[in-house]
């Protein structure tokens, strides 16, 4: 257990062996750590089961800080690389976290902030790169996320009245059945102009939200060429004035069956949501796809759509 803002850790060489399920390598409390400065974890690790690599906690109004930049490979199912509470966690551009194992989480955050400037490649089934509860998450323009089947790039749950933000300015690549950005509750999701969400897998979701009142916005690029995929998806919005807005480009591949097609923008909110394909917005669909599905649809400025 390492406690205090003046703490440091210098681990160079050797090996850590974990034998108990659910163990943590690091327990950090009220710290301010930066890789290569006052935190060095250059050692080997072996484990018989899932574990948490770094568990970091701060306090309300006094968040712990972790700026992590190292190369690590996770070789066990059910593992969390960083678990944080009341903390600001940043993966620097030097960070590279990889795993082919199942149900691996890159960063889990509760009541904090997460920024990814590095690379997360978690290709095992049901893995999540960045997962937060009551947390702001950003994948910056240098951030590169890859997840396998039935996983998520960025997932935010909010059970408070406050608003939390999920922003993607980097690259998110998805396997079949995975979602790029997902928000539940008062979560504002934005795929910015430099954001790129892509998948060749079956049944992928680019952006998805459920509940709350915050708009869902795409200004970047969403390319889903696998069948039965949805570019932007919104549901359970019960307050009027909500918008699902596209000023970017959504591209879909061919669908095998017109009765179960890929959809560019899908809203299940009735008239509570306006679907806006605004100036510069493009929806390009392959054979037997649907560009926009919803009850309150608007095309503004030079917004366009093609689907067949």
Predicted segments — roles?
Residues 1-22, 32-51, 60-78, 88-103, ...:
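Beta-strand-rich solenoid/repeat architectures in extracellular/passenger domains
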Residues 84:
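Anion-recognition interface
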Residues 110-112, 133-135, 185-187, 211-212, ...:
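Short glycine/proline-enriched coil/turn segments at helix->beta-strand junctions
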Residues 158-160, 184-186, 210-211, 236-238, ...:
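Short aromatic-glycine motifs in intrinsically disordered, low-complexity regions
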């Amino acid at each position: 257990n390492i406690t205090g803002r003046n703490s440091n850790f210098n681990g160079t060489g050797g090996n850590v062996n974990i034998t108990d399920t659910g163990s943590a390598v690091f327990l950090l409390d009220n710290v301010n750590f930066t890789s290569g400065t006052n935190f060095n974890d250059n050692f080997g690790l072996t484990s018989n089961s899932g574990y948490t690599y770094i568990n970091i906690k701060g306090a309300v109004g006094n968040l712990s800080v972790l700026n992590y930049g190292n190369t690590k490979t996770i070789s066990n199912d059910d593992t969390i690389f960083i678990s944080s509470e009341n903390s600001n966690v940043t993966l620097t551009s030097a960070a590279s976290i990889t795993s082919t194992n199942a149900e691996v989480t890159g960063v889990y955050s509760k009541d904090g902030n997460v920024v990814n400037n590095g690379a997360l490649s978690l290709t095992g089934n049901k893995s999540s790169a960045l997962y937060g509860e009551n947390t702001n998450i950003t994948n910056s323009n240098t951030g590169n996320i890859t997840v396998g089947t039935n996983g998520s790039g960025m997932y935010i749950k909010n059970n408070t009245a406050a608003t939390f933000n999920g922003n993607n300015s980097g690259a998110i690549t998805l396997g079949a059945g995975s979602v790029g950005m997902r928000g539940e509750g008062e979560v504002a999701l934005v795929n910015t102009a430099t954001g790129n969400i892509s998948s060749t897998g079956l049944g992928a979701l680019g952006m998805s939200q459920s509940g709350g009142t915050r708009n869902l916005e795409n200004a970047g690029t969403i390319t889903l060429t696998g069948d039965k995929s949805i570019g932007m998806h919104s549901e359970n919005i019960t307050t009027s004035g909500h918008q699902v807005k596209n000023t970017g480009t959504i591209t879909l591949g061919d669908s095998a069956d017109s009765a179960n097609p890929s959809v560019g923008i899908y809203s299940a909110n009735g008239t509570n949501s306006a679907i806006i394909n605004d100036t510069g917005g493009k929806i390009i669909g392959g054979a037997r796809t649907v560009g926009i599905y919803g009850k309150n649809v608007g095309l503004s400025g030079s917004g366009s759509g093609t689907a067949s």
